[in-house]
């Protein structure tokens, strides 16, 4: 199972390419969508609410499962631990997009603790969602 995460607020072609590349790394693709509270921490408000982002992503052909993050900070550490509880026998891969590498994400410790394989810099950053919305990171 390949796991990816992000705000996807709004979803754009760079995200779609990220999902497609990640889905090729394993049998199933699970997308963790950062929740509305996390979006407020990042940008002060979200462009699209978590439910709408989740529904759009779930409709994509390359996506098998979608989970709204249960975390209260900017990470998805608790959400990854939740996935481990529900998929204890699965070989898990946590893949980050081209705009992130594991030197700058807090999920590294959880991945190392539970033996989750990590793949970073998947694809390249084409455009920021903030360019579409006008909302800037705070």
Identify the meaning behind each predicted range.
Residues 1-138:
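Nucleotidyltransferase catalytic core that binds NTPs
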């Amino acid at each position: 199972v390949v796991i990816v995460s992000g705000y996807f607020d709004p979803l754009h072609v760079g995200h779609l390419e990220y999902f497609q590349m990640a889905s090729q790394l394993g049998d199933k693709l699970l997308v963790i969508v950062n929740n509305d509270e996390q979006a407020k921490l990042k940008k002060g408000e979200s462009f699209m609410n978590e439910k709408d982002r989740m529904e759009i992503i779930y409709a994509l052909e390359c996506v098998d499962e979608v989970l709204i993050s249960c975390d209260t900070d900017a990470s998805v550490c608790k959400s990854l631990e939740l996935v481990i509880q529900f998929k204890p026998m699965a070989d898990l891969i946590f893949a980050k997009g081209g705009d992130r590498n594991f030197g700058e994400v807090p999920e590294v410790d959880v991945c190392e603790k539970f033996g989750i394989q990590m793949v970073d810099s998947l694809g390249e950053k084409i455009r920021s969602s903030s360019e579409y919305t006008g909302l800037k990171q705070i």
